[in-house]
Amino acid sequence: MKIRAHHKIATAAACVALLASACSGSDKPQSTTAEGFPETITLAAIPAENSSDLKASYDPLIKMLEKQTGSKVEFVQASDYAGVVEGMIAGNVDLAFFGPFAYVVAGVNGAKMTPLGAVIKDEGGAPGYQSYGLARADEDNINGLKDFAGKKVCFVDPGSTSGFLYPTAGLIEEGVVKSGSEADISAAMSPIFAGGHDSSALAIANGDCDAGFAFDTMVDKTMIDKGDLKPGQLKTVWKSDMIAGSVFAANDALGPEVIDKLKTMFAQDANVKSFEEEGFCEGDACRITDERAWGVVPVTDADYDGVRHVCDVTGSEKCKG
């Protein structure tokens, strides 16, 4: 498979090193705040798009956490899923924002963590989203996943739920590929890892890929709002089942009392309405993560069993870490 330069192994290694050096580490003794939280809380995430300032989309959440915990929140932008997973396993990350696939893989690899809540697009909504199979609107020969056979197909990242795992399951169900192995996928098409959901969509729009995958909001809203895509420029030829939402998780090393407090905090106060009331931000600037989420709602580990099932269907090596 082809992988863009910024997703090479050296970059992944550098990412892990960054997490190791920049973070205080949950496994290291440190004093606590008056509220009972570590003096420094490390929050790690990766961009769903090629963002140079991911932190800005977390600012309202960071302000809320710092006010309620009395802690200094240290934000770390990782370059790929592997860095965040390794940081959590190593105890160098206290809180992390995971795609569903990365959350499951982190657990498989031994990360001890508890889900704090999953993001929702709008107030009152359910935590979940879909993967889209995409082609250019003027491409008459691609109208479903079967038509991806023999084509240049953009995936996002080997650790992406909606950019790799669910698409692979769909391709297997349509008989396009035999399994989720690199060899079987490469035998059926020319796969390219674009590195981001926006990069995947742009590569399709620009003709660098004949077809590909990205998650729904990135194509339906984010890129159109930014002017990167025109309405109707791409067509959706496939939609996955609903995928459990991207999730904030806490390192179990924080302890059950702290984690319970964080669960309540995320459920009650990690949302646009609360951020605005506190004066942390206004309007769309209050939407958090680069998924532009309205807020966070409670979830359990069992909510991610659907992802585990798709791992079983695909037999993907990536599900094993």
UniProtKB/Swiss-Prot annotation:
Gene Ontology cellular-component terms listed: ATP-binding cassette (ABC) transporter complex
Membrane topology: Lipid-anchor
GO biological process: phosphate ion transport; transmembrane transport
Induction (free text): By phosphate-limited conditions, via derepression by PhnF, and probably also via the two-component regulatory system senX3/regX3.
Entry keyword set: Cell membrane, Lipoprotein, Membrane, Palmitate, Phosphate transport, Signal, Transport
PROSITE patterns: PROKAR_LIPOPROTEIN (PS51257)
Transmembrane segments: none
UniProt subcellular location: Cell membrane
Sites of S-diacylglycerol cysteine lipidation: 23
Position of the signal peptide: 1-22
Lipidation (N-palmitoyl cysteine): 23
NCBIfam families linked: 3A0109s03R
UniProt similarity note: Belongs to the phosphate/phosphite/phosphonate binding protein family.
Record's function text: Part of the ABC transporter complex PhnCDE involved in phosphate import. Responsible for phosphate binding.
Subunit structure: The complex is composed of two ATP-binding proteins (PhnC), two transmembrane proteins (PhnE) and a solute-binding protein (PhnD).
Stated name of the protein: Phosphate-import protein PhnD
Gene source species: Mycolicibacterium smegmatis (strain ATCC 700084 / mc(2)155)
